[in-house]
């Protein structure tokens, strides 16, 4: 449960016991619940921030500490890729708590890249509409693609290509790839 910091600490402890040569992380867990600025609750905001921001921050720090503690060579394969959302560049008022948490994740990506270099590269991918939102019908899903500047949206294959690029581009850190 990523809203329970004790569970997150236990996850990190168990991981470090089993994987001393841990060098990479993709932060893909996420909570995506609808609310607006007029109706958000502190409980919903805290859940979004815990899952979409605080837990990834803890995991990134744990990975960095593992690299240093185990004197893992400062190679460019030590990396984090955060999955955020293209909403960070195309704000709209829906999914208020979710959007705030992804904006925080964007800042986390840049701050972590600065804080953990040169031992750890930290980048992010910000996909747009790839999958339908909960309760979104097929027609509305297809219409939403047309709101993109290219009149289409990213695909799962685009996401894989971005992951491959960031994984293998050893000179890139602090970058957010918008899809």
Segments predicted by a language model, with ranges:
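A glycine/serine/threonine-rich, flexible loop-to-helix segment
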Residues: 124-149, 153, 158
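Conserved NAD(P)H cofactor-binding loop of Rossmann-fold oxidoreductase domains
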Residues: 28-34
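Conserved Rossmann-fold SDR core element
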Residues: 106, 116-130, 172-179
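Rossmann-fold cofactor-recognition segment
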Residues: 1-4
């Amino acid at each position: 449960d990523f809203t329970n910091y004790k569970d997150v600490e236990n996850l990190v402890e168990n991981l470090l016991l089993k994987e001393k040569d841990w060098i990479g992380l993709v932060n893909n867990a996420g909570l995506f619940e609808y609310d607006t600025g007029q109706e958000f609750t502190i409980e919903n905001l805290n859940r979004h921030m815990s899952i979409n921001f605080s837990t990834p921050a803890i995991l990134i720090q744990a990975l960095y500490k593992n690299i240093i503690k185990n004197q893992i060579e400062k190679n460019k394969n030590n990396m984090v890729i955060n999955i955020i959302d293209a909403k960070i560049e195309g704000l709209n008022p829906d999914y208020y708590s979710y959007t705030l948490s992804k904006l925080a994740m964007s800042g986390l990506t840049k701050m972590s890249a600065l804080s953990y270099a040169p031992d750890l590269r930290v980048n992010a991918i910000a996909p747009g509409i790839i999958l339908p939102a909960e309760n979104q019908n097929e027609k509305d899903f297809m219409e939403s693609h047309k709101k993109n500047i290219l009149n289409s949206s990213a695909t799962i294959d685009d996401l894989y290509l971005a992951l491959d690029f960031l994984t293998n581009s050893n000179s890139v850190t602090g970058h957010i790839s918008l899809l």
